[in-house]
Amino acid sequence: MEFDTIAAISTALGEGAIAIVRVSGDDAVEKVNRIFKGKDLTEVPSHTIHYGHIVDLDTNQVIEEVMVSIMRAPRTFTRENIVEINCHGGLVSVNKVLQLILAQGVRLAEPGEFTKRAFLNGRIDLSQAEAVMDLIRAKTDRAMNVAINQMEGRLSKLIGRLRQDILETLAHVEVNIDYPEYDDVEEMTHNILIEKATHVRSEIAKILETSKQGKILREGIATAIIGRPNVGKSSLLNSLVQEKKAIVTDIAGTTRDVIEEYVNVRGVPLKLIDTAGIRETEDVVERIGVERSKEMMSQADLVLVVVNYSEALTNEDEELFRAVQGKDFIVIVNKTDLPQAIDMERVIELAAGNRVITTSLIEEQGIDELEKAIADLFFEGTIDSADVTYVSNARHIGLLTQAGKTIGDAIEAIENGVPIDMVQIDLTRTWEILGEITGDTVHESLIDQLFSQFCLGK
């Protein structure tokens, strides 16, 4: 497959030590060589790096001092010739270098176009391409490991084996239908077909079992911190983040809006949401914050309910407990450095079997226990991203669910005595759905939509 030559800045825009302009295409080396003063890049070996200068051909002025990496097809990310120009970081010089390259007849790359070419040229499949963006967006080491495993093809191999099993079954069915007179062909009975289809459904179910944890590792746990004003919600946020993101004062109602922050808790990414203290108030701005707090609480995957150890439970406290019933929540009884006024037995009763943890955030006590409780709640205390192939992408989860239902329909049809040639339809559809995960059976419009979500230069 032949494409034109493209270029883009591959590093984040802004001031920094180094910025990289990436060029990919059959004539990438020749195009860059025109504006490079140093060695003749067309003569140098592949996978080498060379010092020189970028020159404006119109003025013969040196624009940048650079190091240029030459990587020749097919041993490159896109399977095309790739040139990477390492410039000094900054906006002006790197943009000037890019403009000089574009002036040589090179096109500015679209978002994700380098990765798209890697997919279209057969270097990676679609699930591996999506893992590239997951790696970029990873919030924890665990999420990074899951993305790397997918980039290395773990999920692709699982899907490939399932599709091969289905294909062999379909071929067996086809032979039985077209050549029933052949004595050396094993008869495809309903029992054999049920056994093979049940195996596929079981394998799909095993992969889907990892989806909840996989999605958490990829997207994080939306965690709302709720409680009455001045019980220590912002202090809890700051303790988990380990830096002062929220204003902490003795004045009730200081947090009037929703503060969001990602934090790594024992490999689990939490999207922490510090909400405005929930109480009845006449302050218009604070009241808006309270309403937003209630909305965020309803949308959260996990709720941290904070109450004050040094104060008796109020009707507002009890109302919060009622509001979180049916959700995953942990109760934090804060300010244990002060004299006790709260009824702990009542707190435990309201917690209804959920964890209750006592803390003194001002003395940094109880945070380790809270972090362990969060990991226990979602991962039973352990996250084994090394040996488990997690499925974390919502598109993949949806397709696997759809494939599981379709193969289930096939099994039901077999059990009801539907002719084998009719069962072929559901088996073929299952094979096609699984192929959409890896991109073997996917529409071009979906490919364009997926890669448009990538950053420019990737």
Swiss-Prot record:
Membership in a protein family: Belongs to the TRAFAC class TrmE-Era-EngA-EngB-Septin-like GTPase superfamily. TrmE GTPase family.
GO cellular component: cytosol
Taxonomy, superkingdom: Bacteria
Compartment list: Cytoplasm
Entry EC number(s): 3.6.-.-
Gene name of the record: mnmE
Domain TrmE-type G: 220-379
SUPFAM superfamilies xrefs: P-loop containing nucleoside triphosphate hydrolases (SSF52540), TrmE connector domain (SSF116878)
Residues reported in the UniProt entry to bind K(+): 230, 249, 251, 254
Function according to Swiss-Prot or TrEMBL: Exhibits a very high intrinsic GTPase hydrolysis rate. Involved in the addition of a carboxymethylaminomethyl (cmnm) group at the wobble position (U34) of certain tRNAs, forming tRNA-cmnm(5)s(2)U34.
Binding residue positions for Mg(2+): 234, 255
Keyword presence, tRNA processing: yes
Amino-acid positions noted as binding GTP in the UniProt annotation, renumbered to this chain: 230-235, 249-255, 274-277
Cofactor binding, per record: Binds 1 potassium ion per subunit.
Cofactor annotation: K(+)
Keyword tags: Cytoplasm, GTP-binding, Hydrolase, Magnesium, Metal-binding, Nucleotide-binding, Potassium, tRNA processing
Name by which UniProt lists this protein: tRNA modification GTPase MnmE
Binding residue positions for (6S)-5-formyl-5,6,7,8-tetrahydrofolate: 22, 84, 123, 458
Subunit (UniProt): Homodimer. Heterotetramer of two MnmE and two MnmG subunits.
Matches recorded under InterPro entries: G_TrmE, GTP-bd, GTP-bd_TrmE_N, GTPase_MnmE, MnmE_dom2, MnmE_helical, P-loop_NTPase, Small_GTP-bd
GO molecular function terms noted in the UniProt entry: GTP binding; GTPase activity; metal ion binding
Single Gene Ontology BP annotation: tRNA methylation
Keyword Membrane in record: no
